[in-house]
């Protein structure tokens, strides 16, 4: 995949700084990953797929003033969304020190003033309402709904990055949409869809 070409074909406008930020992010990720094993993705093509996967939702997400990403890991999707949405305050929650340090380093190196890195488990954070809550964590949708309770209200949207099993995980009482792209299923939950 040619990442830049694929991103330019998206039905959205990315900030002028986006491609420079992505390039620097990738350079740092490859260096850090050799020492700290931040992600299982080791080659450029896989990283490019992860980046595309992370930024794709800006084609359908509403504009928002703040976003919480639960379990950001090496930056997917929260950090990538922050680069694509510079007007949105993005809080990245990552309990592992090595990953949180990497996120903090990227924030400082790229001057991402819209990013806040929190090195905690989301369960240990004080409640605060966010307009959008995201997660690419490999846990059940019901668990994500439980973890996000103190961070959303009736107007908030939840965006969970899921695979094929999403259909087995969704409660029919939820108001949701599933946006499918290749093997990815973006589960968008909210009262006002």
UniProtKB/Swiss-Prot annotation:
GO cellular component: cytosol
Listed Pfam families: GidB
Main location: cytoplasm
Keyword line: Cytoplasm, Methyltransferase, rRNA processing, S-adenosyl-L-methionine, Transferase
Example GO molecular function: rRNA (guanine-N7-)-methyltransferase activity
Residues the record lists as binding S-adenosyl-L-methionine: 71, 76, 122-123, 136
Location in the cell: Cytoplasm
Superkingdom: Bacteria
EC number of this enzyme: 2.1.1.170
Listed InterPro entries: rRNA_ssu_MeTfrase_G, SAM-dependent_MTases_sf
Catalytic activity field: guanosine(527) in 16S rRNA + S-adenosyl-L-methionine = N(7)-methylguanosine(527) in 16S rRNA + S-adenosyl-L-homocysteine
PANTHER family listed in its UniProt record: S-ADENOSYL-L-METHIONINE-DEPENDENT METHYLTRANSFERASES SUPERFAMILY PROTEIN
Function statement: Specifically methylates the N7 position of guanine in position 527 of 16S rRNA.
Family annotation (NCBIfam families): rsmG_gidB
Family to which this protein belongs: Belongs to the methyltransferase superfamily. RNA methyltransferase RsmG family.
Name recorded for this polypeptide: Ribosomal RNA small subunit methyltransferase G
Organism encoding this protein: Sulfurimonas denitrificans (strain ATCC 33889 / DSM 1251)
């Amino acid at each position: 995949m040619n990442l830049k070409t694929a991103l330019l074909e998206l039905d959205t406008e990315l900030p002028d700084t986006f491609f420079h930020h992505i390039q620097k992010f990738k350079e740092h990720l490859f260096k850090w990953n050799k020492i700290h094993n931040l992600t299982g993705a080791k080659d450029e093509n896989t990283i490019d797929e992860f980046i595309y996967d992370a930024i794709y939702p800006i084609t359908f997400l509403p504009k928002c003033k703040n976003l919480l990403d639960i379990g950001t890991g090496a930056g997917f999707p929260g950090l990538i969304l922050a680069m694509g949405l510079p007007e949105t305050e993005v809080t990245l929650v990552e309990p592992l020190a090595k990953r949180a340090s990497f996120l903090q380093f990227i924030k400082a190196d790229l001057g991402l003033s819209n990013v806040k890195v929190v090195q905690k488990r989301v369960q240990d954070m004080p409640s605060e309402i966010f307009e959008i809550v995201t997660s690419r964590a490999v846990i059940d949708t019901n668990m994500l709904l439980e973890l996000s309770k103190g961070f959303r209200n009736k107007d908030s949207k939840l965006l969970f990055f899921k695979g094929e099993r999403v259909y087995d995980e969704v409660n029919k009482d939820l108001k949701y949409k599933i946006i499918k792209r290749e093997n990815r299923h973006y589960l968008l939950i909210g009262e006002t869809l």
